[in-house]
């Protein structure tokens, strides 16, 4: 599994402009990610998702996030997430390690 501290830096640089992770955190352009692991796509309470996200029907976990974060628009065509993805598998693993910790505190 990845490095939590490196993952935190990646989150701050590439994700925090649109997402929060803390319990009770506000939705920004993207949804708050608290409780992400084990949740189905398009299910953060109070966030307005595209039909593509709601209908994808997968449960977020290490494997699904690894694939999604490489190329979000390929994994969920029609998502409104404009992020191009993270090509390096090691960086995705670091980010997922951080998300696993930060979205569960």
From Swiss-Prot:
GO terms for molecular function: electron transfer activity; heme binding; metal ion binding. GO terms for cellular component: cytosol; mitochondrial intermembrane space. Heme c binds at residues 15, 18-19, 81. The keyword Electron transport applies. SUPFAM superfamilies: Cytochrome c (SSF46626). Binds 1 heme c group covalently per subunit. Keywords: Acetylation, Apoptosis, Electron transport, Heme, Iron, Metal-binding, Mitochondrion, Phosphoprotein, Respiratory chain, Transport. It is found in: Mitochondrion intermembrane space. Coiled coil: none annotated. Electron carrier protein. The oxidized form of the cytochrome c heme group can accept an electron from the heme group of the cytochrome c1 subunit of cytochrome reductase. Cytochrome c then transfers this electron to the cytochrome oxidase complex, the final protein carrier in the mitochondrial electron-transport chain. Belongs to the cytochrome c family. This is Cytochrome c. It comes from Macaca mulatta.
């Amino acid at each position: 599994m990845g490095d939590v501290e490196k993952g935190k830096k990646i989150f701050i640089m590439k994700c925090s402009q649109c997402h929060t992770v803390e319990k009770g955190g506000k939705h920004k352009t993207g949804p708050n990610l608290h409780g992400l692991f084990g949740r189905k796509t398009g299910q953060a309470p109070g966030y307005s998702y595209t039909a593509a996200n709601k209908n994808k029907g997968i449960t977020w976990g290490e494997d699904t996030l690894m694939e999604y974060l490489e190329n979000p628009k390929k994994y969920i065509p029609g998502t409104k997430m404009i992020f191009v993805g993270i090509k390096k598998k090691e960086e995705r693993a670091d980010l997922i390690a951080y998300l696993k910790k930060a979205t569960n505190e």
